[in-house]
Curated annotation (Swiss-Prot):
SUPFAM superfamilies: Enolase C-terminal domain-like, Enolase N-terminal domain-like. Converts 2-succinyl-6-hydroxy-2,4-cyclohexadiene-1-carboxylate (SHCHC) to 2-succinylbenzoate (OSB). Does not show N-succinylamino acid racemase (NSAR) activity with N-succinyl-L-phenylglycine as substrate. Mg(2+) binds at D213, E239, D264. Belongs to the mandelate racemase/muconate lactonizing enzyme family. MenC type 1 subfamily. It catalyses: (1R,6R)-6-hydroxy-2-succinyl-cyclohexa-2,4-diene-1-carboxylate = 2-succinylbenzoate + H2O. Keywords: Lyase, Magnesium, Menaquinone biosynthesis, Metal-binding. One of its GO terms (biological process) is amino acid catabolic process. Its cofactor is a divalent metal cation. This is o-succinylbenzoate synthase. It comes from Desulfotalea psychrophila (strain LSv54 / DSM 12343).
């Protein structure tokens, strides 16, 4: 026996009410909680999938985890023990090199080296980071984890009938959010514009920032006119107006749109060389980082460096993780000391979520 053990359990998350996106309506989502134990210490991570968006084949997650568990049981974890001895209690101002070391360990374990299982790789990265902190779920210690700083976040408005969306908008405004993100593309575009017009009648751009996310719902043919129409509401940006893998069409939109465009789905599944090529071809105003969909913090951080080199803005978004994954993503986000609202969830979506020490007050996410 190596003294190293990987275990997991599937625990699908149940939505309090159906969650509508342009890809359909979700009532539950597949989730696995993983645990990595070595020499009496344990670390936890989460495999979080979004059906129709995540690359990881849902039906193969259990098999991949079983294969990895067998490999790890048979392996003498010399490298991991050395890593934990050298990095345990490390100064996380050097978090990039810590993540690089973890990436090397995951590569040696053959975890999604072909990019087919980014969410699974993220879960193992999380578990290794948690091991470093002694299993305290303090993936990245900072003034955020100490409760000294908070992260500005947007309030998310789910798709649905106009009355349901209006109800959500009023609730988020009452909670003190200074930035709202509306998912659009599921109902009639005129009705969505009427909703935006109604918000703007009451709140100026200085009082309330509005972002919209089309999840690729527009076509290259109708997108220019729709972007022009949306721009009259003085929006901050629109996420993924057309579906991914249409680089020339998206590049034309980014060059000519009166509204800033943020790429989201466009980042999923691209290898190292493709990432630079895509950013150079499309030249978006922003990119959005979702670690579960990109293979974890190491790869998401590489995207950020590429964006910064090109003068492209970014923000970080959770992707329907449980409170475990959300906490890790929030801690990583805090390292970048964001001043603009991030797209971090608040753990309120599910009937069976894990306990959390995070809370939102006045549009700021922090340790409660």
């Amino acid at each position: 026996m190596s003294g190293m053990e990987l275990s997991y359990r599937r625990s699908d998350l149940i939505f309090k009410r159906p969650a509508g996106t342009s890809r359909g309506v979700l009532t539950s989502k597949p989730t696995w909680f993983v645990r990595l134990d070595i020499d009496g210490h344990g670390g936890q991570g989460e495999v979080s999938l979004i059906p129709g968006l995540s690359l990881d084949p849902e039906e193969q997650i259990g098999r991949e985890l079983d294969l990895l568990a067998r490999r790890l049981r048979a392996e003498e974890p010399i490298r991991l023990r050395q890593f934990l001895a050298e990095r345990g209690g490390a100064d996380f101002s050097d978090y990039r090199s810590v993540l690089t070391d973890i990436a090397g360990i995951l590569d040696s374990w053959q975890v999604s080296t072909d990019g087919r299982f980014p969410a699974l790789r993220f879960a193992l990265e999380m578990a290794l980071l948690d091991l470093l902190s002694g299993g305290r779920q303090e993936w990245f210690a900072s003034d955020f984890t100490r409760g000294e700083k908070r992260i500005p976040v947007n309030g998310l408005i789910w798709m649905g009938e106009a009355a349901f969306m209006q109800e959500q908008i009023e609730a988020k405004l009452a909670e003190g959010y200074g930035c709202l993100k509306l998912k659009i593309g599921a109902i009639d575009f005129d009705k969505e514009c009427a909703l935006l017009a109604g918000i703007r009648e009451s709140f100026s751009p200085q009082q309330l920032e509005i972002r919209v996310d089309a999840n690729g719902a527009f076509s290259p043919a109708n997108a220019p006119q729709r972007l022009k129409r949306l721009s009259q509401f003085h929006l901050h940006s629109i996420e993924q107006p057309i579906r991914q893998h249409q680089w020339s069409e998206m590049a034309a939109l980014c060059a000519n749109s009166p509204l800033a465009i943020a790429l989201d789905e466009e980042l999923i599944g691209l290898g190292a060389e493709q990432r630079s090529a895509m950013l150079d071809a499309i030249r978006p105003q922003y990119i959005i980082l979702k670690p579960s969909l990109l293979g974890g913090f190491h790869y998401a951080g590489q995207w950020i460096e590429l964006a910064r080199e090109r003068g492209i803005g970014f923000w970080i978004t959770s992707a329907l993780e449980s409170n475990l994954g959300l906490a890790a993503i929030a801690q990583w986000t805090a390292l970048y000391q964001p001043t603009m609202p991030q797209g971090l969830g608040t753990g309120q979506l599910y009937t069976n979520n894990l306990p959390s020490n995070l809370a939102v007050d006045g549009g700021l996410l922090g340790v409660s």
